Design a protein with these regions (language model features):
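Divalent-metal (Mg2+/Mn2+/Ca2+)-assisted nucleotide/phosphate chemistry catalytic cores
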Residues: 1-109
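Conserved nucleotide- and phosphate/pyrophosphate-binding catalytic cores
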Residues: 69, 87-247
Length: 247
């Protein structure tokens, strides 16, 4: 919370624990379930990293999509924001809202960042996840660790399925604007790009070396997360709790 508040001061947090103990929560879970079908719930299991077969092993998994839809109603959310892997839950919430005469939330989905291990950005099985420590970037990673992880990242000489270019297109360029790739003078000196498209073009043409791209990515990422790390480190107790929670 402390890290997030660096960029969003004044934000209010609601945890799942706050919601599930609220009045009428579980009644709404049952109402959403009744407004849907077993087939629809089975399709939505992918939102929790499961496939449709997993539902046959454990009945409780079928409650999760209905709970996620109920969360949206409990928050009185006008907008449901999530990765593309959450679209089944959001569509369930929209469809059930019609049947239950509830306000219909707008669903906004962001692209998934691909695992550094490669490939594919839109494949939920290959998305960046903390369950794969070498394939993901964490908010508490030092600059040295970011550089090490990215140095081993899958970075093919094309755009499709390139997780390093994904990071620039969907995260770094929108946050930083002007793009600077630092290079030693003996290798041509620093490169500056005023748009992601020009960075991509330079990489695909071969004028930007993969290692330079990776090192520049690590430096830019650290520029963004450093203020959050410094804020959290100013409260050692919170920082220790963060590290233990994400291991």
């Amino acid at each position: 919370r402390q890290m997030f508040s660096v960029f969003c001061p004044g934000v209010k947090f609601k945890t799942a624990n706050d919601l599930v103990h609220g009045e009428g929560y579980w009644e709404m879970v049952l109402r959403v379930s009744k407004a849907s079908s077993l087939k629809r719930m089975r399709r939505a299991l992918s939102i929790m990293g499961r496939d449709e077969v997993d539902g046959d092993k454990d009945m409780s998994k079928f409650f999760y999509p209905a709970m996620q839809a109920t969360d949206i109603y409990a928050l009185n959310a006008d907008l449901a924001l999530g990765g593309m892997d959450q679209r089944h839950a959001h569509m369930l919430a929209r469809d059930a809202a019609d049947k239950l005469k509830l306000p219909k939330p707008v669903a906004l989905h962001t692209p998934l960042l691909g695992s550094l291990s490669g490939p594919g950005r839109m494949d939920t099985d290959a998305k960046m996840s903390k369950s794969d420590p070498t394939g993901t970037l964490l908010i508490h990673d030092s600059k040295k660790k970011l550089t090490k992880k990215l140095s081993k990242a899958y970075c093919p000489p094309e755009r499709e399925g390139n997780p390093v270019l994904d990071i620039w297109q969907y995260l770094l360029e929108p946050a930083l604007g002007n793009i600077i790739i630092e290079r030693p003078e003996k290798f041509g000196g620093n490169l500056t790009f005023d748009s992601y498209e020009k960075l991509e073009s330079a990489y695909l043409s071969g004028s930007l070396h993969p290692l330079d791209l990776k090192n520049g990515t690590a430096a830019a990422l650290y520029q963004i997360i450093k203020p959050m790390q410094e804020s959290c480190e100013s409260n050692p107790k919170n920082y220790t709790s963060l590290l233990s929670a994400i291991k």
